[in-house]
Each structure stands twice: as C-alpha cells, then as structure tokens.
Amino acid sequence: MRRRRRRDGFYPAPDFRDREAEDMAGVFDIDLDQPEDAGSEDELEEGGQLNESMDHGGVGPYELGMEHCEKFEISETSVNRGPEKIRPECFELLRVLGKGGYGKVFQVRKVTGANTGKIFAMKVLKKAMIVRNAKDTAHTKAERNILEEVKHPFIVDLIYAFQTGGKLYLILEYLSGGELFMQLEREGIFMEDTACFYLAEISMALGHLHQKGIIYRDLKPENIMLNHQGHVKLTDFGLCKESIHDGTVTHTFCGTIEYMAPEILMRSGHNRAVDWWSLGALMYDMLTGAPPFTGENRKKTIDKILKCKLNLPPYLTQEARDLLKKLLKRNAASRLGAGPGDAGEVQAHPFFRHINWEELLARKVEPPFKPLLQSEEDVSQFDSKFTRQTPVDSPDDSALSESANQVFLGFTYVAPSVLESVKEKFSFEPKIRSPRRFIGSPRTPVSPVKFSPGDFWGRGASASTANPQTPVEYPMETSGIEQMDVTMSGEASAPLPIRQPNSGPYKKQAFPMISKRPEHLRMNLEL
C-alpha cells in the first residue's frame, strides 16, 4: 500500500494527530521611556529668545547653517511613530506554497511599514477548524509559542503573528531552498559526506530544543527546509511536547510511522530519545533511499519497527553502520543520545569526525547543495502543483463569537529584530549637536519589552514575575517578543491583493521530479 504523505507544502498547516500540549500564559506590552531631555525652564526661555533672534535673520548667540539641519518629510508615518499594527492587508500574495486541512501557506511580500518589500511565508489557519477540537487548539498555541521561544540558526524564524475575527496568521521567514524531501526525491540517495552535513546541522537544532525541554517528535524529510544558501531549518512544531526534562516521559501516540520510535508505538512512555531514533531513521533514508522499516500497510510497518532486524547495505562505511546501529536501538535507555550528554553524545561519534562544530553553528561550512535561484521570489524548489495556483486568501467571513475567541488572546507577536529596526529608524539622532535640541520636542524611544500578567498564551505561572531567560548566544539576534492589539472583530475583511503567478522578469520552471525513491515512498500529490 502506498504511503500517504502529509503533503501540506511549505511550513505545513498543523496536522493534529492525537497531539497533546499545555496552555501557556504571558502578555507583553510596549512601555514608553520618559523623555530623554525635557529641558529646564531657563533653557526653554533661552530657546524662546533664540527663536526671536532667528526671526530677525539669525543674528544672536547662535548662527545656524543648513549643514546643521536635517530634512525629513512630514507624514503620518513619521509623526505617528511606533510599531505598526500588522494585519492581512500589510502583505501582497505572490504564490501558493502549500495547503492543509486547516488553511494555506503563501509566499507574500510586505507592502507597508518595517520590512517593506521583503519576502515571507504566510501561514493562514482557520479558527473555526481549529476550535472544533481542544487538542487542535492547544497544539496551535504550542506551535506558536515554541516558535516565539526558540531562536536558533537551524530553526525557522517567526517574524509576526496576528489574527482577525476568523483566522490566525503566522509570518515566517521564507526558505527558498525548499524541502529536503525534494532533494532526496531528485537525488534518490545522498553520499555520506552530504548526509553528514545535514545530519550535523539537524543534531544541533534537536540539541537546542532538548535544552529547552522540548521534544520535536516529527523529524522527517518533509519537515526539514533549506534556506537560500542550502542550510537546514526545522519547521512544523505542531507535534512538539514541552516541559520534558530528564526523568520525565509522555505517552502521546504521534508522529510519522516510518520515523517513529518503538516506545511511541508501544505507548510505554517516551522522552527526548525518540528524536535520536528518528535521526537514525532519517539517516538511513538519506543513505539508502527509504526508511529502515517499511511495510505494505500501517500494521506491517509497525510490526517491522518492533520486531525486524536492521538490514544495512554493504556499501556503507564502518562509521555509518555503527552510528545507525546505535541510533536505531529499540531499547531507548541504551540508544545513543539518551544519556545526559544528549546531542553531544551523537556529535562525538566518528561519523562526524570531520565536522567543525563552531564553524557549522556559525554557518561558515559550505552546504553540499546551494539552490540555483533567479531572484528572492524564486519558487523553483517547491512543488509546482501548488505554485502554479492563483493565490487567494478567502474573505474572513467565519468570525467566531467573542467567547470562542478568548482562547486566542495573546496570539499576536512581533520579532525583536523588527522592533529594533523600528526603534533605529525613528531615533532621528543628529549627527552634530545642534541648538535645535533645546527648542524641539524630545524624542520618545520605544523601551525594552516588559512582562505583564493575564494572557492565556504565556509560558507558565512564573512568566509574569520572572525575568525572561537569557538565550544561549548564537550568531544571530536574541529572543524577545512584543504584544500588539488583538483584532476580535467579526467583520469580514477584504481579500488580500493578488499577484498572478508566473509573472515578472524571473520565471523559472520547477526542477523535474526524478522518481528514484521506492514507489510506496514517492510523493503523493493528491490533496
């Protein structure tokens, strides 16, 4: 029987297969600092005299030349400074990247405010579909909160999150390299050095999640994206389980069967060691063209995972064979990575002996595959079944009641990098200290983000009183969030502006799908 692949495309809409998650709390707001320099009455009086002198030809204690003045256009944007309110109309639809049971994923361009002109992926989820099931709602919250909390070079970045009366919107970085699955589909199998690179970057992402008490639980080629340089980015955090530290287990039956650890199938309780089994299954898939245990149907696949011997092709090196055996141990306690060293145990294996981990984390190691892209908007690495469709975000005409909308309070988010850019853009610091400083209005910069209680989407009872944990330093921006207004209106919003596909100066056909993988594992294009 042919395996049905969850074909949601880029950043798939959550597929809540018996998932579990916990609600969280915490609201963040913008606080304005006190004026930098209000000035004394004497200074104001002196300023008044200065103005009088300027009215008479600039004669007086200050001679002001034009080189000391800064010109800028007076507009609504420059006068009403501060973070913009993000809404669907801020984005122009470019292409469809994927579809799922809960909504669509679009390639979009921001057309207003900060990041104007930049390309993103916009994940649109229908509230009415999500609230039908409590677990679906909880896992939507969990995915959004994990994306907010986790910042790492090999994990997708959340830029904005906002909502309307009937929809949730996640604005993510656009990863133009497409899915790792597409590369496997095209190449058939990877050489060991190629697989080593991808597995090393993935192991660093998994290790970072585990440090935060998060189990990923859905590692497979479809959930591994590549950026424009070819580096790995983990996506789709709907199956993650939080607050799983040493000694803690969970019992949810979830994941994709071919990559699922035996302890999940047996429902005997599992911990972060399941991710290392999945890494082994993924490694086997990369090197042989299929996962280690597959059957004609779901039951036979499960039986093989629980009972069958691992068959290793003779062409694999001794290091690859040894790593596969240690990752695919059915006894979770003896599995490589299950010990206190976690990712460090896996990374110390001789298979990774040529990896410089510091340079890898800094993304200084050249990827084995670099996408050939014609422009920032290039979608050639994505399935043309989706990209050739006309992008349409249906009108928001299914608004929930006010009580039903309460579960989505606190969904809104703005990435700290965006807040910093807004702060820098509107600082208007003079290059030369000018007398205008004494007579103009003082600047009011945006203050650092502060905690405040009362939100349903935070991270536990202590979130409102404790300082946010300082993240591990990576070669990227640090974490932080910003709460903005939540739209609860039941009014229907107009559809987003549409750009027709295959338009513009850059038009490139998707690469041909060379079907080298086994028939039952090939991409199922039926929705």
From Swiss-Prot:
<feature type="modified residue" description="Phosphoserine">
    <location>
        <position position="434"/>
    </location>
</feature>
<dbReference type="InterPro" id="IPR008271">
    <property type="entry name" value="Ser/Thr_kinase_AS"/>
</dbReference>
<dbReference type="GO" id="GO:0005654">
    <property type="term" value="C:nucleoplasm"/>
</dbReference>
<dbReference type="GO" id="GO:0031929">
    <property type="term" value="P:TOR signaling"/>
</dbReference>
<keyword id="KW-0007">Acetylation</keyword>
<dbReference type="GO" id="GO:0045202">
    <property type="term" value="C:synapse"/>
</dbReference>
<feature type="domain" description="Protein kinase">
    <location>
        <begin position="91"/>
        <end position="352"/>
    </location>
</feature>
<dbReference type="InterPro" id="IPR011009">
    <property type="entry name" value="Kinase-like_dom_sf"/>
</dbReference>
<dbReference type="Pfam" id="PF00433">
    <property type="entry name" value="Pkinase_C"/>
</dbReference>
<feature type="modified residue" description="Phosphothreonine; by MTOR, NEK6 and NEK7">
    <location>
        <position position="412"/>
    </location>
</feature>
<dbReference type="GO" id="GO:0043066">
    <property type="term" value="P:negative regulation of apoptotic process"/>
</dbReference>
<keyword id="KW-0496">Mitochondrion</keyword>
<dbReference type="GO" id="GO:0005739">
    <property type="term" value="C:mitochondrion"/>
</dbReference>
<keyword id="KW-0418">Kinase</keyword>
<dbReference type="InterPro" id="IPR017441">
    <property type="entry name" value="Protein_kinase_ATP_BS"/>
</dbReference>
<comment type="function">
    <text>Serine/threonine-protein kinase that acts downstream of mTOR signaling in response to growth factors and nutrients to promote cell proliferation, cell growth and cell cycle progression. Regulates protein synthesis through phosphorylation of EIF4B, RPS6 and EEF2K, and contributes to cell survival by repressing the pro-apoptotic function of BAD. Under conditions of nutrient depletion, the inactive form associates with the EIF3 translation initiation complex.</text>
</comment>
<dbReference type="GO" id="GO:0004674">
    <property type="term" value="F:protein serine/threonine kinase activity"/>
</dbReference>
<dbReference type="GO" id="GO:0106310">
    <property type="term" value="F:protein serine kinase activity"/>
</dbReference>
<feature type="modified residue" description="Phosphothreonine">
    <location>
        <position position="444"/>
    </location>
</feature>
<dbReference type="GO" id="GO:0043491">
    <property type="term" value="P:phosphatidylinositol 3-kinase/protein kinase B signal transduction"/>
</dbReference>
<keyword id="KW-0723">Serine/threonine-protein kinase</keyword>
<dbReference type="Pfam" id="PF00069">
    <property type="entry name" value="Pkinase"/>
</dbReference>
<keyword id="KW-0053">Apoptosis</keyword>
<keyword id="KW-0067">ATP-binding</keyword>
<feature type="region of interest" description="Disordered">
    <location>
        <begin position="1"/>
        <end position="54"/>
    </location>
</feature>
<keyword id="KW-0771">Synaptosome</keyword>
<feature type="active site" description="Proton acceptor">
    <location>
        <position position="218"/>
    </location>
</feature>
<feature type="modified residue" description="Phosphoserine">
    <location>
        <position position="394"/>
    </location>
</feature>
<keyword id="KW-0472">Membrane</keyword>
<keyword id="KW-1000">Mitochondrion outer membrane</keyword>
<feature type="region of interest" description="Autoinhibitory domain">
    <location>
        <begin position="424"/>
        <end position="527"/>
    </location>
</feature>
<dbReference type="GO" id="GO:0005524">
    <property type="term" value="F:ATP binding"/>
</dbReference>
<dbReference type="GO" id="GO:0006417">
    <property type="term" value="P:regulation of translation"/>
</dbReference>
<dbReference type="GO" id="GO:0032869">
    <property type="term" value="P:cellular response to insulin stimulus"/>
</dbReference>
<comment type="similarity">
    <text>Belongs to the protein kinase superfamily. AGC Ser/Thr protein kinase family. S6 kinase subfamily.</text>
</comment>
<keyword id="KW-0808">Transferase</keyword>
<feature type="domain" description="AGC-kinase C-terminal">
    <location>
        <begin position="353"/>
        <end position="423"/>
    </location>
</feature>
<keyword id="KW-0131">Cell cycle</keyword>
<feature type="binding site">
    <location>
        <begin position="97"/>
        <end position="105"/>
    </location>
    <ligand>
        <name>ATP</name>
    </ligand>
</feature>
<dbReference type="GO" id="GO:0005741">
    <property type="term" value="C:mitochondrial outer membrane"/>
</dbReference>
<dbReference type="InterPro" id="IPR016238">
    <property type="entry name" value="Ribosomal_S6_kinase"/>
</dbReference>
<dbReference type="GO" id="GO:0071363">
    <property type="term" value="P:cellular response to growth factor stimulus"/>
</dbReference>
